[in-house]
């Protein structure tokens, strides 16, 4: 692999890592603020833990490639969190609103992984790591989506 390709892979992995860190923060925030059953809190805590494990797997791949792993969330994630804090201060938080926001974040994360996988810029080993991470992302997305639709029923 040439240096340019390696740097592209590291950049892609770090972008995904930053977005996953945003996801961890989002799930932790949702668990702390949801008013519903402890089942929701437990689900969000479990997802935050799962996402943290995925973050670590992507960081390990960045290190294997000789890069410096991302250790903070994205600027967009921080901006989105400030918006949510302002929105919550104005409108209050309720379970449905929190779950809707979590699902929005999951949609965004799933799209980021799909874009990375469809790009054709990942080598075999790195692609395998990203595909494994994507399985976790897709599972979380589907679980939150089902939760949201269950509340609407």
Segments and roles (model prediction):
Residues 8-16, 38-57, 95-101, 125-137:
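Alpha-helical scaffold segments that form or flank carboxylate-/histidine-based iron centers
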Residues 16, 23, 54, 61, ...:
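Amphipathic alpha-helices that form helix-helix packing interfaces
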Residues 40-76, 147:
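Conserved alpha-helical segments that form or flank metal/cofactor-binding pockets of metalloenzymes
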Residues 60-97, 101-110:
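Carboxylate-rich helix-loop segments that flank metal/cofactor sites and access channels
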Residues 98-153:
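Preference for long, well-ordered alpha-helical segments
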Residues 4, 41-42, 69-85, 126-134:
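Charge-rich, acidic-biased intrinsically disordered regions
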Residues 30-35, 62-65, 90, 117-120, ...:
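Secondary-structure edge/capping motif, primarily at the C-terminal ends of alpha-helices
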């Amino acid at each position: 692999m040439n240096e340019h390709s390696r740097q592209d892979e590291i950049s892609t992995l770090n972008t995904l890592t930053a977005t996953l860190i945003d996801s961890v923060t989002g799930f932790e925030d949702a668990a702390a603020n949801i008013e519903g059953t402890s089942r929701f809190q437990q689900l969000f805590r479990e997802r935050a833990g799962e996402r943290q494990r995925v973050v670590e797997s992507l960081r390990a791949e960045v290190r294997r490639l000789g890069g410096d792993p991302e250790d903070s969330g994205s600027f967009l994630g921080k901006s989105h969190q400030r918006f949510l804090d302002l929105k919550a201060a104005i409108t209050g938080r309720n379970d449905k609103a929190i779950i809707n926001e979590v699902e929005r974040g999951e949609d965004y994360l799933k799209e980021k992984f799909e874009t990375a996988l469809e790009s054709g810029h990942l080598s075999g080993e790195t692609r395998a790591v990203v595909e494994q991470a994507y399985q976790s992302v897709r599972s979380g997305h589907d679980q939150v989506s089902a939760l949201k639709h269950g509340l609407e029923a």
